[in-house]
Regions:
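S-adenosyl-L-methionine-dependent methyltransferase catalytic core, i.e., the SAM/SAH-binding region
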Residues: 1-192
Length: 192
C-alpha cells in the first residue's frame, strides 16, 4: 500500500493465486473470513461490500485502487487514526496468498521434530496471529497429557511432556532496543 503496483503479494512467483485473484473473485463471505481471521479487521463487512461494489464496475488492479476502496468503506474517525487504514486488509491478503500460517505451522512442527535432547527452538513473531500460533504449538508440545485423577495409575506410568517451555511469557524488546530499532516494537521471542 506504500507503492502503486499490480495486486500480487506472492512470495513464490510461480504459484497461481495472487492478491488480484482474491480481491476480484472471492465471494463476500470469503473476503469477510480472511479479513476477520488474518487481518483481525474490525470493519470486515463494510470493506468486503466496498470491494464487491467496486469490482462490479471494474476490476481492482492496483494497490492504490484497493487502498481507495478500503478508505471509502471506513468511518472518518478511523481514517484520522495513527497507522495506515489498509494495513490489516493487506496483511490478510498477504497471509491468504502465501498460506503463511500453514507454512508457520508446518515449520514449527518440523523444527520441533528435529530438536535433539536438551535442544532449543527460538521463534520470533511480529504479529498477534503468528504469536498466538507459536504459543499454542509450544503449549501443546510442552504439556503432559491430561489424566483423570480418578483413574488408578502410577506416577511412573504417566507420560511426561516431550519438551520444556523455556519462556512462559514472550520476551519483548527493551526500551534500549526500541530506540535503536523501532521495528522491534512488535517482535516477541518464545523459546521451547
Amino acid at each position: 500500500y506504500r507503492y502503486d503496483a499490480r495486486l500480487d503479494m506472492r512470495m513464490n512467483q510461480e504459484q497461481e493465486l495472487d492478491a488480484y485473484q482474491i480481491v476480484n473473485t472471492y465471494s463476500f463471505e470469503e473476503l469477510c473470513r480472511i479479513l476477520r481471521e488474518y487481518g483481525e479487521e474490525k470493519f470486515t463487512k463494510p470493506i468486503a461490500r466496498a470491494i464487491e461494489k467496486q469490482r462490479a464496475i471494474q476490476p481492482i488492479e492496483t494497490t492504490f485502487q484497493l487502498v481507495d476502496v478500503i478508505k471509502s468503506a471506513l468511518p472518518d474517525k478511523v481514517l484520522r487514526q495513527k497507522g495506515h487504514p489498509a494495513k490489516q486488509t493487506f496483511q490478510a491478503l498477504r497471509i491468504e496468498v502465501n498460506d503463511e500460517l500453514g507454512a508457520l505451522q508446518k515449520g514449527l512442527e518440523e523444527a520441533l521434530s528435529l530438536l535433539k535432547p536438551n535442544g532449543r527452538c527460538a521463534i520470533i513473531t511480529f504479529h498477534s496471529l503468528e504469536d498466538r500460533m507459536v504459543k499454542n504449538v509450544f503449549k501443546e508440545y510442552s504439556s503432559a497429557p491430561y489424566i483423570d485423577p480418578r483413574i488408578p495409575i502410577k506416577a511412573s506410568d504417566i507420560k511426561q511432556a516431550d519438551y520444556n517451555l523455556i519462556t512462559k511469557k514472550p520476551i519483548t524488546a527493551t526500551d534500549e532496543e526500541l530506540k535503536e530499532n523501532h521495528r522491534s516494537h512488535s517482535a516477541k521471542l518464545r523459546v521451547i
